[in-house]
């Protein structure tokens, strides 16, 4: 199958090209060409007042469309989450489980493994957020399940989760270096979060190889004059990346903008999205612009990656090109996946076509 798409601009992930056509054969980028260079039998699909950009990547969300994965623990909830992601221009996602019972974690691993083996596209793997976090910074997590990591538990999750668990959020002050190294040696991306670490503790974790932090500012020790905390350590270490939530509730837009100035290419977006549910360990209540637990504790967002992009440009004041990179190029870089987040000749591509004026999704190649 051969297709050609013409918009005002194509953002490849590296550069912005004007007036050129994206030519695709069998879902592989055949080239980015001048309109007159196309084969004569190709009909060009035209999208005026739009631009083409790589599809988005979300490394942290818990469910969608009424299905919370940690409660349902079935492939149907992964399908529902995938559908939710696609409505916001996101073609790749990391399903996330907050602090939970070992039984549920193991069931989640089994289900994600089954889904990955089915050949369905979109799911990158499982992100375990907890249980090895600091109860002082638990946020909406269930304190009864929070613990320091017994080695036998770590080894069990690593054994069962091989090739399935791709990311773990933990509090470095709760974990021995040996445990952190053990997890990283299994090829799992370790992210520091839900942590009350001092600046020294956080900096040490980054120095021994922890490459990232989870939802900057939220559930972490703040930056203060006499104690820079984890936020200060993240700002200070030029090798560390961090996710951030951009909807004005979890983090003020000015803080997003300031952090972008401080961190540049090291900052990327997640949605942290949950869905309404009244059963199970995590009961999320929709409050219009956020989700909370029944007691009012902030528990997640109602964002898509598309609405995140729009907020970044219109409310945080970050340039469109950088906002696009924060939704695609930079998380792909953290994953060290050269095939994600860019439009390149010879590669399979997922892309969005977005209205330049409204920043609304017009077309996605992966629906």
Feature map (PLM): residue ranges:
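N-terminal metal-binding scaffold of metallo-dependent hydrolase/deaminase domains
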Residues: 1-38, 358, 364-365
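Active-site mouth loops of central-metabolism enzymes
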Residues: 63-75, 142-146, 189-193
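Active-site gating loops and adjacent loop-to-helix segments of metal-dependent hydrolytic enzymes
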Residues: 83-94, 134-162, 204-216, 220, ...
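His/Asp/Glu-enriched, well-ordered alpha-helical/loop segment
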Residues: 229-242, 260-347, 351-354
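Active-site core of metal-dependent hydrolases
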Residues: 155-276
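Conserved, mostly hydrophobic/aromatic
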Residues: 128, 183, 213, 312, ...
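Divalent metal-dependent hydrolysis catalytic cores, especially in the metallo-beta-lactamase
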Residues: 61-66, 79-108, 121-134, 161-175, ...
């Amino acid at each position: 199958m051969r297709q050609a798409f013409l918009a005002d601009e194509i953002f490849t992930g590296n550069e912005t090209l004007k007036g050129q056509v994206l030519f695709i054969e069998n879902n592989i980028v055949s080239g980015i060409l001048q309109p007159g260079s196309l084969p004569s039998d190709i009909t060009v699909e035209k999208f005026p007042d739009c631009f083409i950009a790589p599809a988005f990547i979300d490394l942290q969300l818990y469910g969608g469309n009424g299905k919370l994965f940690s409660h349902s623990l079935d492939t149907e909830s992964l399908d529902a989450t995938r559908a939710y992601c696609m409505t916001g221009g996101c073609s790749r996602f990391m399903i996330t489980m907050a602090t939970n019972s070992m039984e549920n974690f193991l069931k989640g691993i089994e289900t994600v493994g089954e889904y990955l083996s089915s050949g369905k596209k979109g799911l990158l793997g499982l992100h375990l957020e907890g249980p090895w976090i600091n109860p002082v910074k638990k946020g909406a997590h269930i304190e009864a399940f929070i613990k320091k990591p017994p080695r036998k538990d770590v080894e069990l999750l690593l054994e069962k989760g091989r090739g399935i668990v791709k990311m773990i959020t933990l509090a470095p002050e709760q974990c021995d270096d040996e445990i952190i190294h053990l997890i990283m040696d299994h090829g799992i991306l370790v992210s520091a979060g839900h942590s009350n670490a001092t600046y020294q503790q956080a900096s040490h974790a980054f120095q021994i190889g922890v490459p990232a932090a989870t939802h900057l500012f939220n559930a972490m020790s703040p930056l203060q004059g006499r104690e820079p905390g984890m936020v200060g350590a993240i700002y200070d270490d030029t090798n560390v990346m961090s996710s951030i939530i951009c909807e004005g509730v979890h983090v003020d837009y000015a803080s997003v903008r300031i952090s972008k100035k401080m961190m540049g290419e090291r900052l990327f977006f997640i949605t942290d999205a949950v869905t309404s549910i009244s059963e199970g360990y995590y009961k999320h209540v929709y409050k219009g612009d956020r989700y909370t637990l029944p007691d009012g504790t902030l528990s997640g967002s109602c964002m898509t990656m598309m609405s995140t992009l729009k907020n970044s440009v219109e409310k945080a004041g970050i340039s469109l090109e950088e906002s696009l990179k924060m939704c695609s190029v930079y998380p792909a870089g953290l994953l060290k996946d050269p095939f994600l987040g860019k439009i390149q000749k010879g590669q399979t591509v997922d892309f969005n076509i977005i209205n330049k004026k409204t920043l609304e999704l017009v077309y996605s190649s992966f629906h």
